[in-house]
Amino acid sequence: MSEAAAQPPFEIRTVAVIGAGAAGRGFALACAGAGFHVVLEDVMPSNLRRAEADYADLTAHTAAGLLELALTVEDAVRAADVAVDFVPDELESKLEIFSMIDRMAPPKTILCTPSYTLSITDLASCVYRPERCVAVRGNLLHGGSAVPPTVRLLYPVAAAESTLAAVGWFLRALGIEVRRELDPDVPSLIKNTVL
């Protein structure tokens, strides 16, 4: 069985998506379309209504019953295997969301952020489960492109292999190729020791 098809030791079935703006909404719908149970959270009811309308179009084809809407992070992450935040890429916003997810989600939950500018090492250092933190850099929405996108899966030194395997499997299930990389913001001395 190939690595892409092999199930990781930790299986992702329920995805919490925090933030129902355009990117979060699109990612949530892609996850539901791939057969994952998704709980989409946003504090703005209008964003959730838009997601519900988009989802109604999708359910006619494939994903009936796979999307739930939530107005609180606590409700969204209650049973999540992975929580992916789509809040603004600002340190204070990301730290607040990571802290909330860390407090409210079950210990098994992986924290994932599609950050282009922030260090996953810095974010992971502020939670009780740094071994379950990753960042994704690249396009998580490929819109049926013939060429699947490749994203960088960035991880802190503390990341567990099971976390990387599970997130890699999850992203490949969405049609996204994955290239693992130790967080480039890790100091060189530590990188050399780890590698």
Task: Give residue ranges: language-model regions.
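Rossmann-like NAD(P)-binding element
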Residues: 43-46, 50, 60-110
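Short amphipathic alpha-helical segments
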Residues: 28-30, 52-53, 95-98, 123-125
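Short glycine/serine/threonine-rich phosphate/pyrophosphate-binding segments
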Residues: 24-26, 92-95, 118-120
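NAD(P)+-binding Rossmann beta1-loop-alpha1 motif at the extreme N-terminus of oxidoreductases
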Residues: 2-61
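Rossmann-fold dinucleotide-binding core
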Residues: 110-181
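Structured loop/turn residues at beta-strand edges in well-structured enzyme cores
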Residues: 10, 77-78, 128-131
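Helical "substrate-binding/catalytic lid" subdomain
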Residues: 173-174, 182-195
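Structural motif
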Residues: 18, 41, 70, 86, ...
